Amino acid sequence: MAYTTFSQTKNDQLKEPMFFGQPVNVARYDQQKYDIFEKLIEKQLSFFWRPEEVDVSRDRIDYQALPEHEKHIFISNLKYQTLLDSIQGRSPNVALLPLISIPELETWVETWAFSETIHSRSYTHIIRNIVNDPSVVFDDIVTNEQIQKRAEGISSYYDELIEMTSYWHLLGEGTHTVNGKTVTVSLRELKKKLYLCLMSVNALEAIRFYVSFACSFAFAERELMEGNAKIIRLIARDEALHLTGTQHMLNLLRSGADDPEMAEIAEECKQECYDLFVQAAQQEKDWADYLFRDGSMIGLNKDILCQYVEYITNIRMQAVGLDLPFQTRSNPIPWINTWLVSDNVQVAPQEVEVSSYLVGQIDSEVDTDDLSNFQL
């Protein structure tokens, strides 16, 4: 099936599946098959922010005063987060848009990917402020062995889906020879790769950021690197939306409500999805071990972080219909919720950047009674 950027075949978008239907032609938002994606778009747009809005000048002083092992923790997490959001800033668009067939999901994916680019820009904003030569930090990302171990597990599912999608659009179903390699293309196999890719992305959004988040917030609990923590808090708020998006996609697919064949595929892939999550959790535990190899920090150590990884992994896996692999049932660092739930904290607006501020959410109506107490 050849992909077209504007199909001239008239269709009823309310009857199209999320994926593998007719490519989206008119981007219309007066009707939605799944209004959850429209709500996510509106919420993400209301969250719009820029890293330059947050003052990180004090962080440079704090960073210079940190002991070496805490500098290692801080800068390593920024490297890892830069990798994750570099992937997420482009991959959802490249991998998913050619397969999507409803406008609200198409626009949600574009909105999601755009917000990830803001996250990438944020890390540059932070790193540029605390080190004299940011290139030293960025150049290490593609050579750091610990980061590379994680990169392969994240990118491989995207790459496989993108490759088979290209064959499907260009060659169609069947067995083909491409550059001397025999390639078998089938719609069912492509659907399976899509499902596994979405599950991998879900694991990324659900687990892979949270060791880094916890460290950033632990510094701020000690009134250190507070500008960084404010930015990370905004990023965490966005990531919670992205996680909700992938969870809804997966649950619609595995229920069979969108595509009955996807329910069968979800059942077939259940063990592979389980293993995928467990592997992601183990990689995050290994990352915690790497971070704390030279010493822990006040309020946080490797063991506590590993328990937290197990705790959130259970919650995230349950949300997409998978069995729970770990015994940990309670949150070992409950203070982190203060940072992850923006409504939990009241601040004086003149003192700090207000992370709960929403764009386009103001009631602009003014009544004459509102001015009755004014005197000239």
From Swiss-Prot:
The active site is at residue 123. Keywords: Deoxyribonucleotide synthesis, Iron, Metal-binding, Oxidoreductase. Fe cation 1 binds at residues 85, 116, 119. It comes from the Bacteria. SUPFAM superfamilies: Ferritin-like (SSF47240). Its EC number is 1.17.4.1. InterPro entries: Ferritin-like_SF, RNR-like, RNR_small, RNR_small_AS, RNR_small_fam. Its cofactor is Fe cation. Inhibited by hydroxyurea, leads to dNTP depletion, replication fork arrest and genomic instability. GO terms for biological process: 2'-deoxyribonucleotide biosynthetic process; deoxyribonucleotide biosynthetic process; nucleobase-containing small molecule interconversion; ribonucleoside diphosphate metabolic process. GO terms for molecular function: identical protein binding; iron ion binding; ribonucleoside-diphosphate reductase activity, thioredoxin disulfide as acceptor. Pfam families: Ribonuc_red_sm (PF00268). Fe cation 2 binds at residues 116, 205, 239, 242. Binds 2 iron ions per subunit. Tetramer of two alpha (R1) and two beta (R2) subunits. The B1 protein is a dimer of alpha subunits. A radical transfer pathway occurs between Tyr-123 of R2 and R1. Belongs to the ribonucleoside diphosphate reductase small chain family. Provides the precursors necessary for DNA synthesis. Catalyzes the biosynthesis of deoxyribonucleotides from the corresponding ribonucleotides. R2 contains the tyrosyl radical required for catalysis. This is Ribonucleoside-diphosphate reductase 1 subunit beta. The lineage of its organism: Bacteria, Pseudomonadati, Pseudomonadota, Gammaproteobacteria, Enterobacterales.
